[in-house]
Amino acid sequence: MEELDALLEELERCTFQDSEEYSNPVSCHLDQQSTEESKIPQTPKTLSSQGNTSPLKVQLVYATNIQEPNVYSEVQEPKESVLPPKTSAAAQLDELMAHLSEMQAKVSVKADTSRKPLPDQQDHKASLDSMLGDLEQELQDLGIATVPKGYCASCQKPIAGKVIHALGQSWHPEHFVCTHCKEELGSSPFFERSGLAYCSKDYHRLFSPRCAYCAAPITDKVLTAMNKTWHPEHFFCSHCGEVFGAEGFHEKDKKPYCRKDFLAMFSPKCGGCNRPVLENYLSAMNTVWHPECFVCGDCFSSFSSGSFFELDGRPFCELHYHHRRGTLCHDCGQPITGRCISAMGHKFHPEHFVCAFCLTQLPKGIFKEQNNKTYCEKCFTKLFSQ
């Protein structure tokens, strides 16, 4: 495609500069003119042939660089250049080459001794550069003029044929490439960063955020949590593997958990039902309790007075605490909180340890037993000595 670049250079120029040896070229557009007629006078503005008073139209081929004040006559009706159809760059080049072959039979052009042989197809870029040098003189002689479509932002040369507009500039298709891998972008989607173009693969690999789970680039939706980025499908509970729903997640030791697993694994457990304590709770016996679970271990009544008794890590009301410890009075059935008397495998309040017959308090714990009852010595003798 470098041939098209050369085309643009002279398509852009309306006149060409040449060396002194081409100061008097043979024009392919002036037929039947003698050598004397080809000389350009300095004062007249038109050229006329002998025997013909009407002025001849002169086609401007190119301007020269001669230091002498010789000037070509003005072109009255310049001949339009035959432009190739704007179908494709390859079609334009083919038509141009055919036109050159036809004109070479009429125009005498000095051979270019510096012309190099074309390399093979494997070195096609070097071949195009060589063709540019070969075609430059022929294009100047033909006077082909074309309006370029712009200048390539990469090579700074005119663009003919296909053109790509991107990043606010124009490019040859073969020059609009990925900054990293140098692959042609063409009409493929690309990404811009700092004024440079990247293909999708390289852009995501170089600049896209990485998933904290799989470490792959995130090319679509990105989820940000725990100061990291994630693929939405890779942000899930560390215990059960379920993707988090609307209820969100809980974090523990830099790992995300769903609410169910977090509470089951890390929230404090109720000392009564062993389920997680979520809201209101009571703290007692170095653990937490649901209010409805903090009750007597035997009668399951709540502690309305605010006091309880602990036995074997469980709370009890006063009555059942003493019952389990065997400190209920055998006579009245009430807890014994002070002094007590132990007799017949039971405990008694001192005031309740009395004779079963006369109901007098047995002094100093001296008593007689009959049928699991206590008697004072006097009543026992009276009732059972006969």
From Swiss-Prot:
For bias kind Polar residues, which ranges apply? 22-52
- UniProt motif (LD motif 3) ranges: 92-103
| LIM zinc-binding domain segment(s) | 150-208, 209-267, 268-326, 327-386
Query: What subcellular locations does the record give?
Result: Cytoplasm; Cell junction, Focal adhesion; Nucleus; Cytoplasm, Perinuclear region
Report the CDD domains cross-referenced here.
Answer: LIM4_Paxillin_like
Span-the-membrane segments of this chain are none
Biological process per Gene Ontology, one example term: regulation of cell adhesion mediated by integrin
Family assignment?
Answer: Belongs to the paxillin family.
Kindly provide the name given to this protein in its UniProt entry.
Leupaxin
